[in-house]
């Protein structure tokens, strides 16, 4: 039987910080593909609370015991990064209609830039459908309890950064 | 190196008739997964123009020269069919917001019925974003030209059924 | 100066019955174009409360004193009707997102059938944003007051048909 | 202190059958209002699996131990029913965008019929965001497991009706 | 008869400035609940044209003759403010789909922070469906007429601030 | 025959830079109206990559050989500009749902400011449905190929500004 080439998907994002919604998507990703590369975006128009190194380091600790998950970082165009990686699939999460439209636009532009890279959408668990990095930062900065909304491995450092001295 | 298990996705639908939009999704599917099973739904609340046998036969002729594509049919719950197939992924196409909501509801129900089956969405080519089996039937029945909207292998029989004697 | 060709737009619909929302769109249409042809659809999958003749007759009485408005009927494909009319514009009303998606699909298919016919969308007055022929029939049949929701010229006959003997 | 008039809300629906999503909305309703009247719609264009009497009886058993909840039935226009009830609020559930548009249209028409009746929307628990009576019937009829999707008091009779002899 | 506890709803917002849309929502709120607390948000990421004191003062003057309406201000998390107020209901206005998604996300996060606080949505009058504080500021700053878009009690000071010397 | 007054539409935008999507809309505009005025917005909250003069100059070169197209610029309110122009129609492009809502709000506000100015929406070609000035700038700045996404007359200067020295 011809040797089966593993399917690798890139899961790109700013991950500022990494949330339980992101984590649930990666878990569904490794049930769908052989390998998922969590690709942390370096250049982003958003001013982030955590540096690129910190965001990469947090992701590595979260997936320490998941051999199907790799963590990397990239700058510039996502499509250029995927082209020089072993992947030919971009994996994105869908939560609601407004996600859909933005993702649709990005996926069609990426397809124009490289028609051989497929964008595939997975749905977050409904438990995390309202969750985003920005709403977590908003709640934490205003004294709200974000326990359980970020993976436990990074909870303390996220609180320390967002609510110094808490 | 541990033997890599091929990734198989089920692409379910009524396919009454099969459109160029469906075809473009399957082509993107086999660039993403090792194998795609086109699963033609037997039991459907819609009264179809083509019988189940005809719809299965048309799909088989369309993908005759595509070894990565299998054609099958199923009755009852999609999730039950996938459970006894080699696949653990359901592949669906997304065209617009209204698709999104219906698909979201179905995917969450399927996930409740079997949390190990992942629903994955791909986007049709923008050329076919307006295309659906029902709009093709509507146009053909009213004397419109549907050339190029269904795969050429089945154009004559689709016209013959929708516009007898044309 | 070269002679200016008047711009004519076709405003197609089932108009079962004609509503104040339809009327407000036609009024905005004749402020935009030189002439508007209200084209009443003969063949429709919906079973209508009023026959084609009745719907055409009602529209004619409503626009009796509006020289910029013509009333006609058509069967089969809208695009075929427009092609043999003096118009090259199809005028449609937009009320909400779900309208938008259906209209988007129809407009792209019509554009595929004849790229020289432009579909143009106008917005109903916000007063009529919730109004549709079907919600009017629903309310009237259940004894609700639809005064002011259909043009006064046709109020009596609409009530007589929907709530016989009222 | 002037005597406080209790706030009563009418929660209308076909409830064919009553789902856990409906139940979670009523529970949130009685935390918001003093009393909730579950008003089962008699006249409906949908052909129901359960008669009006059966649907009323099921709702009564579900809320047997909830003094803040009353069960009633109505025919004709919802607004006319609310006008002769102690309520001046209509309570509706929102799950997703497509709900939103339909509800928006109904609420604006109801407001036109009686500006003193307020329509108020509550959000279902995210656990039930994909749930509807029709998707439950669809799954059950096709042999799927709907345990936990309808209140336990009515599970047996719902299964018996949808999958006779199971 | 057991003493009826009045239902109080908190209507939070930046109100920069207060609009006729906001006013119409509060009017519908006091037809639904016994008391509405207009809670002006202190901490906001948006840089406001009016200080917190000015926004609170304007709201107080607008509702001077409405005993069912109280005006207050809050900082930090809305849920924390509601918890120490007599209210257990958050009242929000819905205008269109994009509102819906943002509100949905906020309401689900608030529910996670305190499951006993219910978020309830009312619909603005269709007259104000296009109105927002930002579009009013945009129009006024560019010399447009905003008469009738803000309550008359605050029109002069809003114009004076947005178009000094007009 | 009474002399026919030509129909002129204003097509307003920031055009930073002008895209093939904008171009395709203007081409459909001159098939619908006698004349289209491309009105480049001076005052805009967005910080643009090209000055107003550069944006006007680029548009003029693009439509050099199109006598039905005029290029102008305006400051302040669009409605005020249209009122002193020969046009009584504002022409806007619709790509997706999120466009729709923003456009809906703007059109209703413009209608409030001047009920005699009609806003009319045309749909971009599906080829450009994902295209916007901002996504083009984003891709170009990150080294992506934007050939064919802006009219060829302005490609070199757009690249020179976005990727100096390329």
Curated annotation (Swiss-Prot), chains A, B, C, D, E, F:
Which residues hold ATP? Answer: 14-15, 22, 93-95, 103, 128-134
- Is-annotated flag, keyword Thylakoid? no
Coiled-coil zones: none
Q: Hey, which pathway is this one from?
A: Cofactor biosynthesis; coenzyme A biosynthesis; CoA from (R)-pantothenate: step 4/5
Question: In Gene Ontology terms, what is a biological process of this protein?
Answer: coenzyme A biosynthetic process
The reaction(s) catalysed by this protein are: (R)-4'-phosphopantetheine + ATP + H(+) = 3'-dephospho-CoA + diphosphate
Q: Which cofactor does it need?
A: Mg(2+)
Could you name the domain of life of the organism this protein comes from?
Answer: Bacteria
Q: What is its EC number?
A: 2.7.7.3
Any idea which UniProt keywords this protein has? ATP-binding, Coenzyme A biosynthesis, Cytoplasm, Magnesium, Nucleotide-binding, Nucleotidyltransferase, Transferase
Give the UniProt subcellular location, in the record's own words.
Answer: Cytoplasm
Q: Which residues bind substrate?
A: 14, 46, 78, 92
Q: What class of enzyme is it?
A: transferase
Against InterPro entries, the record matches this protein to: Cyt_trans-like, PPAT, Rossmann-like_a/b/a_fold
Where along the sequence does the record put site: Transition state stabilizer? 22
Listed GO CC annotations:
cytoplasm
- Name a GO molecular-function annotation: ATP binding
Q: Which PANTHER family match?
A: PHOSPHOPANTETHEINE ADENYLYLTRANSFERASE (PTHR21342:SF1)
The protein's role, per its UniProt record: Reversibly transfers an adenylyl group from ATP to 4'-phosphopantetheine, yielding dephospho-CoA (dPCoA) and pyrophosphate.
According to the record's subunit comment, the protein's assembly and interactions are: Homohexamer.
Similarity annotation? Belongs to the bacterial CoaD family.
Spell out the protein name for this chain. Answer: Phosphopantetheine adenylyltransferase
Q: Which organism is it from?
A: Maridesulfovibrio salexigens (strain ATCC 14822 / DSM 2638 / NCIMB 8403 / VKM B-1763)
Its taxonomic path starts at:
Bacteria, Pseudomonadati, Thermodesulfobacteriota, Desulfovibrionia, Desulfovibrionales
